[in-house]
Amino acid sequence: MEKISLITGATGHIGYALLKELVDSGEKVRILIRKDVPVFDGIDCEKVYGDVTDSESLDKAFEGVDVVYHLAGVIDINPGVEDLTWRVNVNGTKNVVRACQRCNVRRLVYASSVDAFPPLPDNQVMTELDHFSPKNLDGTYAKTKAIATQFVLDNVHEGNIDAVVVHPGACIGPYDFKVSNVGEMVRMFIKGSFPVSLSFGAYNFVDVRDVAKGMHAAAEKGKAG
């Protein structure tokens, strides 16, 4: 039987880049979407309709799937979306993990974020953590990603699931159809309407295609956790 990879969040910047990466590599890909959009026209992928906040819709979507790439999430940091952010980023991730267990998915690749890491003292190099907590994090997005990340890791440590967690930085590059926050910032900077300066530290940008290749490699070669 041909192996199937499923992507949640395929309409997002990283999700679409990952879809292109997997399809161009010859994989059979299924995408979980809430509604059809023209950007998928001409791409050889199977579309299933559902929502990560609806656990029942995931069982049908995950049936026969070998690898799930979970990228669906709310990144909006504006006020008024806190409840949606919690429902999608935390509850949605819990639903995905449990659906992977029920459907015997071989591996989950979860897209967390560098924002799940707490701020560090000056001149201290960031490294991997063995535990993620919302404590000392600013903003709903960062807190929800930390909580969801720890939920995935807890299930790995308990032997409930085989999963790899990745932490992308600020992605730039093609396929940013919905114009991400980072994409909009870069566009404004190029136009000269958004002067950028850093009083300390640095900001990490990464090509979205490199992130997609990294997630693909994580599915095939990554160590669980």
Question: Which ranges hold each PLM region?
Answer:
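Glycine/proline-rich active-site loop of Rossmann-fold NAD(P)-dependent oxidoreductases
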Residues: 159-161, 173-184, 217-225
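Glycine-rich "substrate-gating" loop/helix at the edge of Rossmann-like oxidoreductase active sites
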Residues: 138-139, 169-178, 197-209
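N-terminal Rossmann NAD(P)H-binding glycine-rich loop of SDR-like oxidoreductase domains
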Residues: 4-25
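Alpha-helical substrate-binding/gating segment
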Residues: 186-196, 202-225
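Conserved Rossmann-fold NAD(P)-dependent oxidoreductase catalytic core, especially the SDR/UDP-sugar
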Residues: 91-141
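Active-site Tyr-X1-5-Lys
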Residues: 137-164
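NAD(P)H-binding glycine-rich loop region in Rossmannoid oxidoreductase-like domains
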Residues: 45-91, 99-102
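Conserved catalytic-site region of short-chain dehydrogenase/reductase
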Residues: 77, 114-124, 171-175, 180
